[in-house]
Amino acid sequence: MNRRRGKIDEKLFLDSEMKGISLIKGGNDYDYCVRLFLDDLELKNLAFHTRRWHRENLHHFKQMLLKLNLPTEPINIAEGNIKQCILHWKRESNLSPTTINHRIRSMKQMYNFLSNEGIVNQIPIAKVEKLKSPQVIIRPFEESEIHGLLRQPDKSSFIGYRDYTIMLVLLDTGVRLIELENMQLSNIDFNDNKILVMGKGAKEREVMFQGTTRLYLQRYLRLRGSLDHDYLWINIMGTKLNRNSVQDRLRFYGKQANLKGVRVSPHTFRHTCAKMYIMRGGDILSLQKLLGHSSLEMVRHYVDLWGSDLQQMHKKFSPVESLFRNG
């Protein structure tokens, strides 16, 4: 029987790694590499939906490689193989540039991880650029449209009252859908009218609400009652309300209100919150913090979008016009 040495020779590890043992085990198995990458994202505490998003993107890449009879082993995939996948999606599948770019982004992140771990020696996607995509402009709600939406929920029922309150929270705080979905009862501070939410990149931030939203939130909590979990938004069974249900309910109210030319979604509420905040004199620095943007780029984009509205606002509140009008 071969006995293990009493003392470990660390050179054994170094020699094995230099000879590429990890390349043989991992680099030849696409699914194994994806699993390692997703595990690393989990260790970095990235949200479940983010990990699922990457998994789906990487799955689509593998399926296309198989369809085109191209190598699927990460150590054998070449830059040309990746470009073939992209061209097929663009020409044959007619996918949007945004969807294709999402897949490119996931593949790049996985290869960067594999390279850092020594599982691959080259990053074939390193020089592959994202596709140019048209900027999608999300039209905010007009005030009349907001009133139309708020008239739809039946506030005499639990579902209607919950949905009405959700719309107020979306409009008042500008939170993302995932942030709304994961709101915790214990993170609401009614003394200072704020809610602690978990934003992108597992970054916490506080969002604010005011008197009307506070009133409906407190009443909703009485309807919600005491449960064995801390999630704020629930369905009639008392379990956590999922994001698909929120989106479906909002679309339903949009149809009931007969809204045309505007997407009725949580993200439209977010854009509407941003616009109304700016139009009522809010500054972009505080808006950036409230919305959880990592830079001012997106907030500046909001201002650019609503230039004509700002012109009307300046016409109404011009310092010089006001001075001479009152003088």
Which sequence ranges carry the predicted segments?
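Conserved catalytic core of the tyrosine transesterase superfamily
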Residues: M1-G327
